[in-house]
Amino acid sequence: MRLGVNVDHVATVRQARRTFEPSPVFAALIAQQAGADQITLHLREDRRHIQDRDLELIKELITIPVNLEMAPTEEMREIALRVKPDRITLVPERREEITTEGGLDVVSLKEKLKEYLKPIKEAGIEVSLFIEAQKEQIDASVEVGADAIEIHTGRYANLWNEHRFEEAKEELNRIKEAAIYAKEKGLKVYAGHGLTYHNVKDFVRELKGYVEELNIGHSIVANAVIFGFERAVKEMLNLIKT
């Protein structure tokens, strides 16, 4: 599996004091040097962590793919078309949430997304949709022209963290079924949300060969505070690639 390192929470620490450090751009460069396959960042509408300039600099300086997570708004589309990340991942956003709480409801947004995504696809940017492991959401993702889906792993992560291992295994089976179905429909399959150094091993063991890439941020940044960013990235890479 590939590893996309999400640098949002490096920016969270910086924005706590509205200062210039730590820099998510430097973190992205270190992650790249450590062997990360991709840099992921979420430019939220409220700019609570990543700022526009972070995105611009990361796209300019990083040589591995850049994955921009964003809400399906006109402002974000304009930014994506200007900066041209390698991939955009559409996610739902609510201002009161601490982090993204669930998948995008592609079924209800289907007609809007068909039109919304056209210029992005014409610009040669890969389109991924962050969704729940549900067949109806996968079918809708195909209909709107997505190239890929990213399956929301939050429920699995929460169950594992609460030591509800049997339920966590059932959730892994549900994710696996969704991944198989999505691949049959011609979609690339990624996954992420809530994955940590502790719960990722079971995920990789069960989903290797079905999921191509994991996007992980908070756990890596949390460990980087103690052990350093390069070591934190390398240790996660060791867990998902062996």
Curated annotation (Swiss-Prot):
Residue positions of the active site: H42 (proton acceptor), E69 (proton acceptor), H193 (proton donor)
E.C. number(s) listed in UniProt: 2.6.99.2
Alphabetical list of InterPro entries matching this protein: Aldolase_TIM (IPR013785), PyrdxlP_synth_PdxJ (IPR004569), Pyridoxine-5'_phos_synth (IPR036130)
Residues the record marks as site: Transition state stabilizer: E150
Enzyme class: transferase
Listed CDD domains: PNPsynthase
Known catalytic reactions: 3-amino-2-oxopropyl phosphate + 1-deoxy-D-xylulose 5-phosphate = pyridoxine 5'-phosphate + phosphate + 2 H2O + H(+)
GO function terms (MF aspect): pyridoxine 5'-phosphate synthase activity
Protein's cellular compartments: Cytoplasm
BP GO annotations: pyridoxine biosynthetic process
One Pfam family per UniProt: PdxJ
Primary localization class, coarse: cytoplasm
Stated family: Belongs to the PNP synthase family.
Protein purpose: Catalyzes the complicated ring closure reaction between the two acyclic compounds 1-deoxy-D-xylulose-5-phosphate (DXP) and 3-amino-2-oxopropyl phosphate (1-amino-acetone-3-phosphate or AAP) to form pyridoxine 5'-phosphate (PNP) and inorganic phosphate.
Alphabetical list of PANTHER family matching this protein: PYRIDOXINE 5'-PHOSPHATE SYNTHASE
Name of the protein in its database record: Pyridoxine 5'-phosphate synthase
Source species of the chain: Aquifex aeolicus (strain VF5)
Taxonomic lineage from the root: Bacteria, Pseudomonadati, Aquificota, Aquificia, Aquificales
